[in-house]
Amino acid sequence: MLSRWTRRVNESRLAQRKLTLLGRAIALVVGELLFNAVCWIAAGICFGKTDGILGLALLAWTIGLRHGLDADHISAIDNATRQLVSQGQLPITCGLFFSLGHSTIVIVVNVAIAVSVDIYDKLDRVGSIGGIVGAAVSASFLFLIACLNIYFLVGAIKQRRSMKRRQALGLPPDEDEGDPSKIYGGGCMVRVVGPILRAVDRPWKMYPVGVLFGFGFDTASSIALLAISAIAQRGPNGDAISHGKIVILPFLFTAGMSLVDSLDSILMLYAYATPDSTSPEGKLALLQYPDPNYKDSYLEETVATTLPAEDGQTERHVIEPIDIPQGETEGLETEDNIKAKTGNEILVEEERVGGPSRVDGSGGVGNERVMKAKANTMSSLSIILTLLSILVALSISLIEIMGLIGDNCTQCQDAANDPDGGGLAGSWWRAWARANDQSGYIGAAIVGCFAAILAGWYGAKWGKKKWKARRDANAAIVLEDNEDDAAETPVA
């Protein structure tokens, strides 16, 4: 009887385990690798006996890897991740949904070619219009998302300065301080960026953004050309390749691009919202276990009562204790960090959050993750990375706009293609064209800069921690030696 009860308790506890941020990141990468493996196994089965087709499959996969490093991809994922983190989310799948949206266009085009090869002849006409639409959407999205992050950055810096100033004066946090995850006011800037914030407030909403980015049909045309080349190949018996098999090529492209974009999304998330090592999310573990003592430690002091009203204020009520399922306490404070909060302490905490705390029936404190996100977005590292991402987004947006103008302006084309160089105008437009052509290298450089900044930052923190520990140890030894010398000195 006892063993059965124990087994049920353990099974219930195991069922309530949740993946940590590290666990979700590893699960995402493992899923991507499995998808890549499945695509390659399918390619080997379909094309293994045909000379040259596996080479085309490898080319499609490497095109996906390289395209995942395009500067517009990196900048869009980076800025969208920063925006969602400022809203209290941990969006680990931004890159995945973006790449899936972009790949949808490639897959649809190649499926159409598998149905009718004549579709390829019409891609040029569609691609000329789609290229303009895709570049315009990409540049506009990057520009608007950069403006939105400028708003968040300015708000975070102002609030950080205000908090430090009030803390130095020994004053409580100002209840009028705005939450950087929200947009207040009614000015022109708010009217412009407000709909953008509401439009992309979940990671899955990066999927339609990726679809719009894919309207350029540049990668779709490249993979379609590989598909046409595969159809032209002959099998060992001289038979033509089945048209249905070429659909594997866009899936290989999708596998490569989604892998790179997912890794980029994970890197950006850890850059902006590295969890505290003392929290369940920040521990080096794949799963976080429910704390059986957590519920009582959190709720034992939240007795239903009414706080006395201060002068000029209405009565404020403390949150009544409700049953919070242990499996849904993700993002709450740990037991060691929980303190009894009554009276003015609760009011101060509410001011610090930017509004009254909210406990809903599904469990969890609604503003807890926003509080942590605010702390993350106001850190020095986050401010540096946000500034870098804004500059990158504005730069990539400018490059794409100038490239779009250069491709569709007759005078610009004449100056760029002038045999005599075209003077200053020719050099100007050729420079923008070269910048567009080097998008993959620019994207790789952006990722490298973020990785270098992260490595340098945490390396410096680790070195500083070790230096302080060594200094404190030496000071303790010197103090102990002085005490021993004082004890051995005879009293006159």
Swiss-Prot record:
Keyword terms: Cell membrane, Glycoprotein, Ion transport, Membrane, Nickel, Nickel transport, Transmembrane, Transmembrane helix, Transport, Virulence
Keyword flag Transmembrane: yes
Topology term for the membrane: Multi-pass membrane protein
Top-rank taxon, per record: Eukaryota
InterPro entries associated with the record: Ni/Co_transpt, Ni/Co_transpt_high_affinity
GO terms, molecular function: nickel cation transmembrane transporter activity
Annotated compartments: Cell membrane
Residue ranges, Cytoplasmic side: 1-24, 72-94, 158-210, 261-382, 461-492
Record topology, Extracellular segments: 46-50, 116-136, 232-239, 404-439
A GO CC term attached to the entry: plasma membrane
Family of the protein in this entry: Belongs to the NiCoT transporter (TC 2.A.52) family.
Protein name: High-affinity nickel transport protein
Provenance organism: Cryptococcus neoformans var. grubii serotype A (strain H99 / ATCC 208821 / CBS 10515 / FGSC 9487) (Filobasidiella neoformans var. grubii)
